[in-house]
Amino acid sequence: MKLRLSFAVFALSIVSAVSAQDAAPAAAPEAAATEAAPAAAPVDPMAAVGAAFAELAQAKPGDAQAGAGKAAACAACHGLDGNSADPLYPKLAGQHEGYISRQLTLFKLGARPNPIMLGFAATLSPQDMRDIGAYFATQKPQAGVADETPIQDELSPYKGQRIVDVGQKLYRGGDAARSIPACTACHGPSGRGVPGPSYPSLGGQHAGYTANVL
């Protein structure tokens, strides 16, 4: 009898323990109790560019004399007077101040990716950029060298014509059949562009550099 009673008590204790365990609510994960941190607002790169352009416009007009010293670091690639000898690097002589200063701004912001130019532009202030632009704008650009090589590409519609001749046709009149607009509309008949930040001078520029940018 005692054995049966002991077994009954033991069985009841097990049932009570299981019932209590089932009744206890599951512990909520700690992560669920903590609210997720709000996501950082996305940065608008165009807003940064616009702000930088506004700051550039507020700087004083470029001082060519002050820019001469500041442009010394540019000489290794672009030449002392802005007439680079290597077609890998553009000629800056005679280029518009507004165009040069705006491009330096884009390099500094990384909006125009170029690791080399980023290193040079990173420490420049808007006034530095305008001064450098003014210096190169006062320099005389050297004439470029025309490529008179005939086009050999069998698939080219200009096969057999000289590169310089085809280039002049496209620059002055475009090619309506291929939806190519004339370059003169923005850069002018002589390639001098429009003073300001948007339409650079192309006259005398290295053909290789121009082709790479296009």
Question: Residue ranges of each PLM-predicted region?
Answer:
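Sec-dependent N-terminal signal peptides
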Residues: L5-S13
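Cleaved targeting-peptide boundary
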Residues: A20-E30
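Electrostatic cytochrome c docking/interface patches
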Residues: P29-A71, A85-D86, A146-A177
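The feature marks the first
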Residues: V49-N114, A211
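Sequence context surrounding c-type heme c attachment/ligation sites in exported
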Residues: A68-A72, E97, S101, R172-T184, ...
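Axial heme c-ligation environment in periplasmic c-type cytochrome domains
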Residues: A85-K91, F107-Q152, P195-S201
